């Protein structure tokens, strides 16, 4: 199999910019044997936190984003400014919040056999965990959507047992 040659990332982004918007927002630049190399654009409006067993590398190319993480039982905002890099450790619940006109490079390791991904939601008022679901990731489009539908379609799951707040579904970003 021929080895993919270097290419100009800025040119690639400009040629694919129309695809770096909702509802998908990301495109694979390399789908290699061990790594997934994605270019991700904003805006997004997700409220879930993603959990996986591998590290994720962020390089923010255009604009600033915030990666919300759960650290020592607290919600923490990690700003990543244009030109900055950030290596997220494995097994850290995280939610990258991307504004309009932002573009970043995200690299993550492909899942090993038996590894699981998870989606978690935390109360926006008191940070109590509302719901979590773990699964072996086979198809990100269908599996994530199924979990989203289960969570957002059930007000009991969205209601905080600690403070009674009800999480509303995220606004749709077009």
Language-model features: locations:
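Jelly-roll (double-stranded beta-helix
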Residues: 1-59, 64-85, 93-174
């Amino acid at each position: 199999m021929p080895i993919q040659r270097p290419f100009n990332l800025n040119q690639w982004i400009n040629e694919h910019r129309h695809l770096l918007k909702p509802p998908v927002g990301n495109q694979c630049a390399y789908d290699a044997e061990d790594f997934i190399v994605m270019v991700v654009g904003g805006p997004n409006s997700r409220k879930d936190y993603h959990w996986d067993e591998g590290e994720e590398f962020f390089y923010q190319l255009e604009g600033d984003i915030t990666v919300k993480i759960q650290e020592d039982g607290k919600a923490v905002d990690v700003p990543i400014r244009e030109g900055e890099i950030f290596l997220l450790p494995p097994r850290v619940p995280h939610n990258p919040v991307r504004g309009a006109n932002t573009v970043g490079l995200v690299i993550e390791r492909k899942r090993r056999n038996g590894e699981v991904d998870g989606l978690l939601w935390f109360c926006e008022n008191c940070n109590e965990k509302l719901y979590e679901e773990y699964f072996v990731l086979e198809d990100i489009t269908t599996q994530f959507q199924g979990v989203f539908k289960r969570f957002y379609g059930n007000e009991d799951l969205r209601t905080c047992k600690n403070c009674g707040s009800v999480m509303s579904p995220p606004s749709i970003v077009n």
